[in-house]
Amino acid sequence: MMKRRIFSAVLLSAAMLAPAALQASAMAATASSAKSANVSTKASSVKSKASASQKTKVLDNGYPFAQVPFTSVKIAQNTFWGARLKAAREVTVPLAFSKCESEHRYKNFEMAAYTLQHPGHAGLDTKEWDVSKFMGFSFDDTDVYKTIEGASYILQTYPDKKMKAYIDSVLNVVGAAQEPDGYLYTARTINPKHPHGWSGATRWSKVEVLSHELYNLGHMVDAACAHYQATGSRKFLDIAKRYADCVIREVGPKAGQHRVVPGHQIAEMALARLYTLTGEKKYLNEAKYFLDARGTTSIHDAYSQSDKPILKQSEAWGHAVRAGYMYAGIADVAALTRDSDYIKTIDRIWNNIVSKKYYLTGGVGARHAGEAFGVDYELPNMTAYNETCAAIAQVYLNERMFLLHGDSKYIDCLERTLYNGVISGMSMDGGRFFYPNPLSSDGKYKFNADGTTTRQPWFGCACCPSNLSRFIPSLPGYLYGVKDKDIYVNLFAGNTSTIQVMGKEVVLEETTEYPWNGDIKILVKKSGVKGANLLVRIPGWVRNQVVPSDLYKYSDAEQPAYSVSVNGKVVEGDLAANKGYLPVKNIKKGDVIRIHFDMPVRTVVANGKVADDRGKVAVERGPLVYCAEAVDNDGAPILRSVVAKNPAFSVIDGYSISNTESQGAPAFSVKAIQTDAQVLDQAADGMVSVKNQKLTLIPYYAWNHRGANQMNVWFYQDLQVLEK
C-alpha cells in the first residue's frame, strides 16, 4: 500500500501541480531559455533524439585502475545488496521525488520561472515572495538534482517509461528557471530584491561561505551527466553546461572575474566528470582552478578547508562532507592532470583520517558543531556526528584512492564504511533516515536532525536522504576494478557481471551470502581474453587488521583462515607483494573459483589515545560492527553493561527484527550474537545492583528500527571501572 501511494504521487506531472500562471510561465520560460542559448525547442528535440543513438564518447578518466561500471554488474535479487537496491528503487527515490513536490522544491523553480517572465512583478514586494520565508536553505535545489541522478542510475538498469517521462516533466520546470546567460539558482532568481538570506546581494558575493551557488552547480552537473548517460537526451546536460559555462565566464583568476572558490565543495568532482563526458577541457581547467585557488582568496576558513592552499594541507579538518568531496575532487583532477603533488596531498590526508579520525563504523566527523572533524583521536560515541553524507564522501574518496594506487587497504576502508557508516543512515525499507550516526544512545538525547531520536522520512535540510537516493543505485559499480588483464574482486555480493578486459568480455557469476558467511563462488561463464587474471581481495579483517593503522586492533586470539581454489586446486600467493590481493591466474570459461573466509566473532580495542574507548571493547563479525540495543535485552541498561575479559560468543541465525518505525514494513532477519555480560542496574530507590545478562547484539546498521532506546557499540570489560 505504501509503495503504491508513493508511486502515485511520483507519477504526477510537475506542471500539473503548478498554478495556471506559473505553469504557463514555465512553458514560456523554457522556450525563452532555449532561444537565449541559440537553440530552438524543435532543434533541441531533434538533437536529443539523435544523441540517443550517437552518444558522446566518454574520455578516459586518467586513473591507472578502472572501475567496472554499475551498468555491467547485475546484483542478484533476494540478497543483502539486492534488497537494498530494491528499497532504493521502489521506496527511497520515489519518496524523494514526492518530497520534492510536497516540500516546495519544484515550486522554487516554478516561481523563478515566473519572475524571469515577469521581471519586477508586484509579488516581489510581498512576504509570499520573500525567499527566506519559504525556502529552508539556499541549496534546496540540489534535492531535485540528486534525486534525478539516482533515478537516472535506476533507469540504466531498470528502464521505466513512466519515471523517464516524469523526470522529463521536472526538467521542463528546471530549465524554465534558468536565466538567459545560464545562471540557475532559484534562491536568487525567484526574487532578486529579497533573495534567500544566505545568497548575498549579488552573484558569488557569498559563495565562499553560505550561498552554495557552486555546490548547486556540482550536483546539477553530476545529475545531468547521469541523465544523459541513462537516456541519451541532452535536455538536462545542456542546462547544466549553460550554467557551467556561466560560471567559467564569471569565476576564475582572470581580470574582471570573481576570484572565489566553492564554500561547499563538489563542483570539482562534477566538472572533472563533465570534462570526461564532453572532452571540453575548460571544465577540467575550472575544477583545477577551484582547487589551486583554495586558501589564496579573501576567505581563510578551516571550516571549508580554505585556511591554506591544498598542497600545504596534511590534516582532515573542518566540515567533514565538504572535506571528503574536496579530497575526492583532488584525486579526480590528479588523475586527469598527472599531478603528483596532488596525489601526495591526498595520501597525507587519507593517512591522517584512518590513523586518527576514523570511527570503527567507518564514519567521520566527530563534532555536531560545524559537522566537523575533531582534533586527532577525538572520537566520542554518544555525541558522534558521523553524518551519512560524510560516510558517502568517504566511499567516494576510498574508491578513488584504489583507482590511483591499486591497494586493497582502500577497499578495506570502503567496505567498513559501506556496511556500517552508510547503510545505518537508511532504514531497511528505504523510507527513513539518519543524518548523524552515533555509536551509543541513551534513547533520550535527540541526536538526529530536526531534534529527533529515530530515523525520519525527510529533514528540513534533506541532504542525506537525497544523497542516499543517488548513491545506493550506483553501488554495484564498486564491486570490481580492472587494469590491463587483471580483474580486481573488491567487494563480495551475489551478481552476474560483464567486464571489459582488453576490449573483450569476461562474464563472471558470483554467488554468496556475504556478509553473513565467508563462502563465495565465482563461475567464469565467458572469457574472451587469454591470460586474464582474477585478483581476490583478502579483507583486512581476515588478515587481523581492523584498519590500516594503529587506531584499532583485535584483542582476541583468533586467527581467521582463508582459502582460494580453482576447480578444486588451492591457490597460493604473496599478499604483501600484491597489496592484499591473491592472484588467480589465467582464468578460462568454466573455471570455478571458491573463496572461503573464516568469520569468527572478534573483539576490538581502540588506541589508548581515544579517550571515550579506553577500557572498552567493540564486537565485530566479518565486515559488520555489532551493537547491543535495549529492546533485544529485556530493556536492560545497555550503557552500563560489562562483557568478560575473554568473552565466549554464539551466533544466532535468522534473528528477526521488526520494523515498527515504518508502517507496513516487514520484519527482516540478521545474524545476531550473544555473550554473557553483567549489567549495573539502579532501582527506583537508588539502590545499585549487579545483574547477569545474556547480552544480544545485532549489526549496527540494524539498530533503531523499533523505536528510541539505549544502544551501545563499545562495552566496558571491568565492572570496577564502570562503578567509578
Model-derived features with residue positions:
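Aromatic (Trp/Tyr) and acidic
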Residues: 54-161, 165, 195-230, 265-282, ...
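Helix-capping and short linker residues that terminate individual alpha-solenoid repeat units
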Residues: 159, 175-179, 232, 248-252, ...
